[in-house]
Every structure is written in C-alpha cells, then in structure tokens.
Amino acid sequence: MHIHDKDYYPTKSLTCVQHPLDVILNNGFTAGHGSSRPAKRIETAAVLACISLETCQNEMHGGQAIPAFDFYLAPYVRMSYQEEVKNLEKLTGEDLKDLYDAPIDDYEEKPLEGLQGKARLEQHAINKTVNRVHQAMEAFIHNMNTIHSRGGNQVVFSSINYGTDTSAEGRCIMREILQ
C-alpha cells in the first residue's frame, strides 16, 4: 500500500485543493490578519486569484488549482469594460449607458481609424479593456512564478484550467493569458 505524501501525515496538513474562486471574487476573503473586498475589475480579480493560491499553499502542501479560471474571471472583463465606458462619459460628457451591456462579439484590439461616434468610443473602450486584461494576466503569471510558499518550500504548485468559458469575455482571458 502507498500512502501519498506520507511525510506530511504527522502534520495533519491538507493536500491538493481546487479553489472556489467565484466565492472569493464575489465575497472577498480573510487571510491571517488581512482581508479583501469583492473584486470589481479584472486587475483585482487576477490578484485575488493569485493570493488565494498563495495563501492556501502556505497552509498546506500539494497542488492548488483553479478549475475554471476563464469562467470565474470573465465577469470582471465586462466590469472593466464598463469602467472604461464610464471614463469616456466623463471625458466626452456624452451619455453612453447604452454601451454598458451592449453585446460584444469579441474583445479584440483594433485600430480606431475610420470609426466615428459611438462605434469609435466603443472600440476605444474595448482596446483599453484588452490592454487591462493583458496586463492582469501577465501580472498573474509573473506573480505565480515568483511568489514563494512556506508549505511547499517552492513557488506555488499551481494549475489553472481554461477553455471553460466561450463568451467574448472568457475568450479574451484565454487569449491574453496565452500571449
């Protein structure tokens, strides 16, 4: 008989967990002496995903996983897009509320040349959002590759599953994390 991770058995340390990232992002969480509020934008959601993995790795050994990374983060792409539209409202003085929930086929950075009016403003907001998602995914990868964990005495032993969300927002997460 083989007892997996027998050397950790006396410590009663837990091993391997999948993180309910949606609960953490929607409700915030407390770790040690600090706490966080719910995420409202993609940058915060990506950082909280990283902190969640790191915090658990410091308390247990074994792999840490986020089973539906793109699915959990997708709503924060839309929230960030809406924030960009609100910034444009402040800048232009125009009412752009109809763009908040307008259907978006894909979040792709495209040139603004030739676009006018709301189409130009919408694409500008999409471009800014794609850049924010890219930066958030890049930060997630850098953080996961450099954060040290006490429990595993290594960088966080982690995995993320993606390809679980086919929405425009989910595809944006996947595309940007793979770049």
Residue locations for each model-derived region?
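Catalytic alpha/beta active-site cores
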Residues: 1-179
